[in-house]
C-alpha cells in the first residue's frame, strides 16, 4: 500500500547497495558508493535491522548541484564490513572537502533512532497517544479543489462551478500552515466519501448538481495514474475516514524544515480537510486542540523533533516521526508557565488556563488507560 500511495522510499541505488552488503557480509570488505543522503541513512538502518557485522559506516556529503547539477542531497557512503561480531550504533557525517572534521552523527540510543546525537534535548521519545493521520488524496486537483470568487466556486481551470456546498469542505494544503490558529480559508475541496471505497452512487440523488459536475469531468478521473483507483467507485478518494470529519484538528505540513503545528477549525463548524502531504491529530473541543498545539510548538518539543527528523529530507516530518512524540512524557515536565511562554512567542492572545491544562492531562491519561 505504501508503494501504491507514494509513501514508500524505494530507490534502485539502495537496492544495489543492500545486495552488495548481502554478498560480502561477514568479510572485511569496504563498500563505497555515491548515493542520495536519504539512501545512505536507510542503508545504515538496514545494517542494524539485519544485524550485519560492520566496523564503521560514514557519510561524506558534497554539493551535488555543483558536481552533477542536481538539487538532491548526495554523498559518498563508506561502509567497513567485518568478519567479527561487531556493530556500530553511530553513523558519522563529514564534508567531502574537509573529511578530517566530523559535521554531525546520527544513530541509535537504547534501540531508538535519532537524527542528531550531538546537543541536548528532552527525551520525549515514546508512543503518541493520539493517532496521526494524513489528509485526503484525490489526484484530480483541477476538478476537486475549488476557490471562491464573488461568492461563486471556481475550479482549477477558473471555470464557475455551480454545485451544492453539502460535500464541499475547507481545505488546508501543506503550504498554508503559516499560523498557529487557522480558521479562514481560500481553498475548498469536494469530498465524495466518508470512508475508503464507499459507494458514491448515492451522490446522484443527494447532491445532483455536484454529481453532474463530477460526471462531466469523469474522463479526468479516469486518467489518474495511481493503481489505487482501479476498481474503486466513481470519483473515489483516499486518506478519508471518520477522523476526517473531526471538528478540531492540530495539523502540520510534512515539508517545512521548522515545524509549525496549527489548530484547524471553521467558524461554521464544518470539518477542515488537509491534503495528503499534511498530518493531523483530532480533538472534540477547541480547548484540547489548543493545549496540544501549544505543547507541540513549545521550544522543548521542537528541539526534540529536531533530534529525530532529518531536515534535508523531502518530507522531514512524517507519520513515523510524529508518532514518536509521547504526550505523557511532555506533560510530566511541562508546566502551565511553559505554555503561557509559548503562547506569547506565537503572538497569541492570552487564552490558556490552568483548568484547560489539567483537563488535557486527564484526557490523555484516559486515552493511555484505553491503550493499555
Regions found by a protein language model. Give the residues of each.
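Polybasic, glycine- and aromatic-enriched phosphate-binding surface used to engage nucleic acids
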Residues: 121-341, 345, 355-370
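A generic secondary-structure signal for well-formed alpha-helical elements
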Residues: 38-42, 55, 81, 218, ...
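Signature of N6-adenine DNA methyltransferases within the class I
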Residues: 1-152
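Polymerase palm active-site segment centered on the conserved acidic dipeptide of motif C
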Residues: 61-63, 351-354
